Amino acid sequence: FGLVGQGVDEDEWFDRASAFAGGEYARGIFLGDEITPADKDALAEHLSAFIGLPKDYLLVRNNRVELEDFRRDLLASRGLVCGRLDQRFTETSLLPSQRASFYFACEDPANHALESCWYVAFRDFLRGDLGYEGPEEYRLSVWGEIGIGWNWVHDEPGFDETTVAAPNLAYDIAVALRRSPTTKLCILGGRYDTATPWWNVRHTMSQLYLPDALKRQITWHRYGCGHMAYTDEPTLHAMAADLHEFYRE
């Protein structure tokens, strides 16, 4: 959006931001209100330089910004909100009276831009190629009615009483790799995905303390796309080549 990183390669900028997030920013946040005023001010200045929100905005929030606040406020002066599945997409802001947090979280410009295309293409495939005649209305997603009540409880391997609402499958991956050390794992992701951010995946995997032999079984590919790599044509070609190479190995 022309707010930060001008003149710097996007991958290089992403790497710089990731290093900041795992270093200076993490240390500052860990200190809580014990951080010195000078360090808090410097942290806000550096964070602003990376994410584009004003320094004063960050200081008021103690340098902590929720995703939905970021999406809502980054381009507020232009009357726009950012996407969640792909931050490159924008659309005009909701009215100030539309304050429901869950509603806004589901209002994703990236999804709105792509879903109608999927809907038309999928309906055409069902009827034209498969000869399927179904209900006139085919709903691509009913998350707000069904998914929100899904039972996410998961027993994490090696833990007692782990019936938590937000399951962590990283331990399952670690167990699978340790039990089958010849298994290969390919992890793909996009820079503009804030639904399942690339940095979060790297950080989670780093907490498994896998031996080097198992780490070498993991292949990483980061692309210039959002959550749905197949909607970005350059990424689609790159991902196909990377997956063909992975399967050959």
Annotate each predicted stretch with a short phrase.
Residues 1, 201-205, 235-239:
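Short secondary-structure boundary/capping segments
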Residues 1-111:
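Alpha/beta-hydrolase
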Residues 63, 183, 197-207:
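Short alpha-helix in the alpha/beta-hydrolase fold that links the catalytic acid
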Residues 89-163:
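Small-residue-rich helix-loop
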Residues 161-176:
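Active-site nucleophile elbow and catalytic-triad environment of alpha/beta-hydrolase enzymes
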Residues 186-189:
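Short beta-strand/loop motif that positions the catalytic acidic residue
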Residues 192-196:
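Acidic catalytic loop of the alpha/beta-hydrolase fold
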Residues 224-235:
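Catalytic histidine-centered segment of alpha/beta-hydrolase-like enzymes
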